[in-house]
Amino acid sequence: MADINDPVLAKPADLCCLKGDFHRGEPTGSIIQIEGVDTYVAKPDPKFTNGNVLLFFPDAFGLHINSKLMMDAYAACGYLTLGVDYFLGDAVTKYSASPLNDPNFDLAAWSAKHLLPSEEIAREWVKNIKAKYGNDGKVKFGCIGYCWGARIVLQQLSDGGICSAGAIAHPSFVNESHVQKSKAPVAFSVPATDKLFSNEARTRVIEICTEKQQRFNMQVFSHVGHGFASRTRLTDPYELWAKEQHFKGFIEWLDFWLARE
């Protein structure tokens, strides 16, 4: 039952979260274990590293090919990029290709199973990441979240989080309290029409961030659907352009804020 005192802004994951394409390519990163949790590590070229760490919180497909290729792309822009398997091997890719191909898969039940545990896994993972990669005090952390990862980005931009700036694409499972508690600069990249994140919800996010004078930016793309940034239909030139613009915008946002003293 919804909490009337904490209105939903981005609705729970739905079948629209399972649409889109799997991309092709050869990931260049590697999987390591951080205190028992699979972690994808994409390293920047030492000649171009900016010395900062980017935490990647994936959509329901977890550490699948699309996520790995995106993390490699962020690493190519200078960030040591780390992605967490907060589904512990039970991501949607275990049951579904694109489009959904397992008629017995119950997305609502799967989401209920993982919603709170994934938050706790992410919280402990971040603590371990900071201990491993941030102890010298010189490293700055940023974060990126797609769909499922949106609220975890907002948590990391709140008191108790470690990130100086973050970015979110086509969110799900976000309540007003997640936005209210966030403090660090945040960027959004969203479709103009999204059944999970309505125009009214977008407007409310803008109102909240404006009222509390939080630094924010919001890209809104027409004629794309939920998932356009992470499961882009590469045969659609406009959708591919929107994906590239979202990526460029996120990099410029992170570069600006993580360069600040």
Swiss-Prot record:
Q: Does the keyword Hydrolase apply?
A: yes
Q: Where is the active site?
A: C147, D194, H226
Q: What happens when the gene is disrupted?
A: Retains 2-benzoxazolinone (BOA)-tolerance and metabolic degradation capability. Does not affect the virulence against maize seedlings.
Induction of expression:
Expression is induced in response to 2-benzoxasolinone (BOA) exposure.
Keywords tagged on the record: Hydrolase
Q: State one Pfam family annotation.
A: DLH
Q: What is its EC number?
A: 3.1.1.-
Tell me where on the tree of life, at the top rank, the source sits.
Eukaryota
Q: In which pathway does it act?
A: Xenobiotic degradation
| Broad EC category | hydrolase
Q: What's in the misc comment field? A: Fusarium verticillioides possesses 2 unlinked loci, FDB1 and FDB2, necessary for detoxification of antimicrobial compounds produced by maize, including 2-benzoxazolinone (BOA). The FDB2 cluster arose as a duplication of the FDB1 cluster with rearrangement and expansion by incorporating additional genes.
- Write out the function statement from the record: Dienlactone hydrolase; part of the Fusarium detoxification of benzoxazolinone cluster 1 (FDB1) involved in the degradation of benzoxazolinones produced by the host plant. Maize, wheat, and rye produce the 2 benzoxazinone phytoanticipins 2,4-dihy-droxy-7-methoxy-1,4-benzoxazin-3-one (DIMBOA) and 2,4-dihydroxy-1,4-benzoxazin-3-one (DIBOA) that, due to their inherent instability once released, spontaneously degrade to the more stable corresponding benzoxazolinones, 6-methoxy-2-benzoxazolinone (MBOA) and 2-benzoxazolinone (BOA), respectively.
Q: What is this protein called?
A: Dienlactone hydrolase 1
Source species, please? Gibberella moniliformis (strain M3125 / FGSC 7600)
Q: What is the lineage of its organism?
A: Eukaryota, Fungi, Dikarya, Ascomycota, Pezizomycotina
Q: Which gene encodes it?
A: DLH1
